[in-house]
Amino acid sequence: MSSRFSLTVVCLIALLPFVVGIRLIPARITSVGDGGGGGGNNGFSKLGPFMEAPEYRNGKECVSSSVNRENFVSSSSSSNDPSLVHIAMTLDSEYLRGSIAAVHSVLRHASCPENVFFHFIAAEFDSASPRVLSQLVRSTFPSLNFKVYIFREDTVINLISSSIRLALENPLNYARNYLGDILDRSVERVIYLDSDVITVDDITKLWNTVLTGSRVIGAPEYCHANFTQYFTSGFWSDPALPGLISGQKPCYFNTGVMVMDLVRWREGNYREKLEQWMQLQKKMRIYDLGSLPPFLLVFAGNVEAIDHRWNQHGLGGDNIRGSCRSLHPGPVSLLHWSGKGKPWVRLDEKRPCPLDHLWEPYDLYKHKIERAKDQSLLGFASLSELTDDSSFL
């Protein structure tokens, strides 16, 4: 796949043990009505309906994975298969539609889709049980390699402070802090993705990022950032706190797309380092933006810089209004609707932003077909056409 490409907008109806306390939900479910977890058909039907995704198979150039769909759940050795690309995402009822679209986009553009292994982290007390969520993923992606883990919210609930936006206070938002504890020890490297992204390029390119030196994470970063906007006046006026980060380069990065070395993460006790800042936040308010500031305090200036094409973030607008945004200049491999506005919500409310139509071809929600019957297709031909149109600036 070339570095620059055209993403065709297709017809809307086309099928395109630490204290964390986790439990594993079997990924291979044969019956939607399997009643475990209190969900059954009832909980399942409330979340759907989703169309079954097309089968995406490896090309001849792919190294065959040793994962067997019939037994990979119980085999920890399968997680250590060097041919696998490991991706971690959260899974909950509110963002389920986004998660399904994200998975679909990864598989559609992956050069070796059968070698992609998803690790889904589900909340213990979500309105849809983790078992029901697992069933829905299996029915939508019958051949997908994945595991579902239950994240106990009491692991982090007492460390969470109020934020600028209520959604940022969701305990599942902090699951990324605990991936080193949640995932099998045999998983030594993982890509973390937020649920409001789609990829339009081969995820293997991101997976192949080299974390040089002792770097623990890689992400698109923006240096020379104004850090005063990420921390409160109480932080900057404290006689000691600013000095703790004075030697770090002021580099901002979005934690919705990260390549993580879990071996270095575990060895460096980075979960504890993040928690220390969260504990301080409970005593004195030093930031307002949820789970991001602790990452900046711990990692800023020591992140492996990844091409900005791998996180075109901010497409959900700001945290208050969720206004429409345009793409950043340059090529695009991943689009990220961080911010208040989510494409599936705006599309359903018939007030989409122009870039939301780039997300829609990956949407497997069945009700979108009914909506498409009442809408004429927009005249957008490609991603490049959207970025070149001055009306989106």
Curated annotation (Swiss-Prot):
User: Topology in the membrane?
Assistant: Single-pass type II membrane protein
Q: Name one GO molecular function term.
A: polygalacturonate 4-alpha-galacturonosyltransferase activity
TM regions (residue ranges): 5-25
Q: Please report the organism this UniProt entry assigns to the protein.
A: Arabidopsis thaliana (Mouse-ear cress)
Broad enzyme group: transferase
- What this chain does, per the record? May be involved in pectin and/or xylans biosynthesis in cell walls.
Q: Name one GO cellular component term.
A: Golgi membrane
Annotated protein name in UniProt: Probable galacturonosyltransferase-like 8
Where does it localize?
Answer: Golgi apparatus membrane
- List the carbohydrate attachment sites: 226
